[in-house]
């Protein structure tokens, strides 16, 4: 008979005895061998065994050692933590006592909050009123007056032509703040393609002294010389404007008012961006600026700026596209015939400015990219510089202008303004501002160097108002009856140079959207939406009674005029004539390029006539109607 489990002597057991009390009160420990027979463990095995001898005895438990190690480690951590806490506490107490001592010694110590921005090391020159002389009035408005003048630095025998912008005596604190903000922005820039501030005079009325641009603004310049401007000039201007705007973007400045009227011509080869009355400086962590109101140029603004008053560097790109369109159409008005209040809906429906007749698809596509609804889809200014620089190396490939290779700008010495300048002042020792300031980057006390007189270096100034976009003939554009060359080509592949002059030339249109005589012409715009009646017909149209300020000398585009004026405001406008000394003709403050209540289907009555001090900070379009900035409802 065999046991089912183990054999312990004569007995069958389920398990070998383990710790059973035996003889002499000793514990008996047994283990099962290979035959399932219980055998006694070695006498020294006091906790059982797994085999014969001492080798079968179990090892001692490691649990106490592990527990001891864990407890010891925790104690060490607690001690180290207490030590660190005491150290930090003592350091905090020392710092607190130090700050308390500094506060007692210096009365106030502001906490340090570094922004990471580079310091603005621009110099603001404070000029004495005796250092400059006002020569003649260039223009005036509700905010003040702009003079042509001469800056004669103290202790030097040079004269620098300048424009002096002076606020009125009874100017509001807000207007003073706006002109000082403008001075801050202009003093912070230093670029060949951005107009610079020469100084500020803090008399009873604040005065800004800026560079005087002898050729006036670019809009006026291209309108006057449209028959002599070739493709190379147009593309070079596009490059220079893009360079100026790229510089402003690098300085985190949003211009908000880029247009051809706000680009000044120093020489036909050199243009500069001006009018920083609306410009805003973004902080290091800001990417957009939210405007609260003010006068805004609706037809040059991006859609997000019109609808939400959001201004970014990419909204400046949109304005740049419209500015390029102005250049390529030789001063045409964007969206002519469309009321400013409808611009947002027109843009939302996908309509854009038409392709100028002289532009190839390459140039027009750049404009279209600038007018994308998605701001991030628009090109950057550095990309625009690269594109137009490439085109400027081969102008006839991208702009098709008849007789392009024979075009040259007329001698500026024939201009009326140049002759007036010569007659009015002793022009000896006249020096250009840029040339004068080169050796004076530090300040005014550096020694004078040899300079080239302005009259010999600048062969002239234009017959424009020196710093203003003048609307000639009271129409906002010149009338050139002797223009006989058909300059526009709708088909870039056509060889119009082979046509004979004797075949009969039609007068070139003054604007792309102007109707031509009965004979078909390639100068007509293909998009009929923008076609307009002839210049003569425009001047004969009666003003719509729905709009205010309908002077005979006002801009004949009533849909742009401010309808949100109280009777008081209307009376002030209609009874406030402004005169230009040179032309002696009356003008109006209304300007169609800027509107007040530009949000769709929204009008809020405003009983106050408000023309901000920054209406045109640089040169104030002298003969141009002055409603270009119409107040935007907050």
UniProtKB/Swiss-Prot annotation:
Keywords: ATP-binding, Kinase, Nucleotide-binding, Oncogene, Phosphoprotein, Transferase, Tyrosine-protein kinase. GO terms for biological process: negative regulation of apoptotic process; positive regulation of epithelial cell proliferation. PROSITE patterns: PROTEIN_KINASE_ATP (PS00107), PROTEIN_KINASE_DOM (PS50011), PROTEIN_KINASE_TYR (PS00109). The keyword S-adenosyl-L-methionine does not apply. It catalyses: L-tyrosyl-[protein] + ATP = O-phospho-L-tyrosyl-[protein] + ADP + H(+). Its EC number is 2.7.10.1. CDD domains: PTKc_EGFR (cd05108), TM_ErbB1 (cd12093). One of its GO terms (molecular function) is epidermal growth factor binding. Residues 132-399 form the Protein kinase domain. Transmembrane segments: none annotated. Belongs to the protein kinase superfamily. Tyr protein kinase family. EGF receptor subfamily. This is Tyrosine-protein kinase transforming protein erbB. It comes from Avian leukosis virus (ALV).
């Amino acid at each position: 008979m065999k046991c089912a489990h183990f054999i312990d002597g004569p007995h069958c057991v389920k398990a070998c005895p383990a710790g059973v009390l035996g003889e002499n009160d000793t514990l008996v420990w047994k283990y099962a061998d290979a035959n399932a027979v219980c055998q006694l463990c070695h006498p020294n095995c006091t906790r059982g065994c797994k085999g014969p001898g001492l080798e079968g005895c179990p090892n001692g438990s490691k649990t106490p050692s592990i527990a001891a190690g864990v407890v010891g480690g925790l104690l060490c951590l607690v001690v180290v933590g207490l030590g660190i806490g005491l150290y930090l506490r003592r350091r905090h107490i020392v710092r607190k006592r130090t700050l308390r001592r500094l506060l007692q010694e210096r009365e106030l110590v502001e906490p340090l909050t570094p922004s990471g921005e580079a310091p603005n090391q621009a110099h603001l020159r404070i000029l004495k009123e005796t250092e400059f002389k006002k020569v003649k009035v260039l223009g005036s408005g509700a905010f003040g007056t702009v003079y042509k003048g001469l800056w004669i630095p103290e202790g030097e025998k040079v004269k620098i032509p300048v424009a002096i912008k002076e606020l009125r005596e009874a100017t509001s604190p807000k207007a003073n703040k706006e002109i000082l903000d403008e001075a801050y922005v202009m003093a912070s820039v230093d670029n060949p393609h951005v107009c610079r501030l020469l100084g500020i005079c803090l008399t009873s009325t604040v005065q800004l002294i800026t560079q005087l641009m002898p050729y006036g603004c670019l809009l006026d310049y291209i309108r006057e010389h449209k028959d002599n401007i070739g493709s190379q000039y147009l593309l070079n201007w596009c490059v220079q404007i893009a360079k100026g705007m790229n510089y402003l973007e690098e300085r985190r400045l949003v211009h908000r008012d880029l247009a051809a009227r706000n680009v000044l011509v120093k020489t036909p080869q050199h243009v500069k961006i001006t009018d920083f009355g609306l410009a805003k400086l973004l902080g290091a962590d800001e990417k957009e600026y939210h405007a609260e109101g003010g006068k805004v140029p609706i037809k040059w603004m991006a859609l997000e700026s019109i609808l939400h008053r959001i201004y970014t560097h990419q909204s400046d790109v949109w304005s740049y596209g419209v500015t390029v369109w102005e250049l390529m159409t030789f001063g045409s008005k964007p969206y002519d015939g469309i009321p400013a209040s409808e611009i947002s809906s027109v843009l939302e429906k996908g309509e854009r400015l038409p392709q100028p007749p002289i532009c190839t698809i390459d140039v027009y596509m750049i404009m279209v990219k600038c007018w994308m609804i998605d701001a991030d889809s628009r090109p950057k200014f550095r990309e625009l510089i690269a594109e137009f620089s490439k085109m400027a190396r081969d102008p006839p490939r991208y702009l098709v202008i008849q007789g392009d290779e024979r075009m040259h700008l007329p001698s500026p010495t024939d201009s009326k303004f140049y002759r007036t300048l010569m007659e009015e002042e002793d022009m000896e020792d006249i020096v250009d501002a840029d040339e004068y300031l080169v050796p004076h980057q530090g300040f005014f006390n550096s020694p004078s160097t040899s300079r080239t007189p302005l009259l010999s270096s600048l062969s002239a100034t234009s017959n424009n108002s020196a710093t203003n976009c003048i609307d000639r003939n009271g129409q906002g554009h010149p009338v050139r009856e002797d223009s006989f060359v058909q300059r526009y080509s709708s088909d870039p592949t056509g060889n119009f140079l082979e046509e004979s002059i004797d075949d009969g030339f039609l007068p070139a249109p003054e604007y792309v959207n102007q109707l031509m005589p009965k004979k078909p012409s390639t100068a007509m715009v293909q998009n009929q939406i923008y076609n307009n009646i002839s210049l003569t017909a425009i001047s004969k149209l009666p003003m719509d009674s729905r709009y205010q300020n309908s002077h005979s000398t006002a801009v004949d585009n009533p849909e742009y005029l401010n309808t949100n004026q109280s009777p008081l405001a209307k009376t002030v406008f209609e009874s406030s004539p402004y005169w230009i000394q040179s032309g002696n003709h009356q003008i109006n403050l209304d300007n169609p390029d800027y509107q007040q209540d530009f949000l769709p289907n929204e009008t809020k009555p405003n009983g106050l006539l408000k023309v901000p001090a920054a209406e045109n900070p640089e040169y104030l379009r002298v003969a141009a109607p002055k409603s270009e900035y119409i107040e935007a409802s907050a």
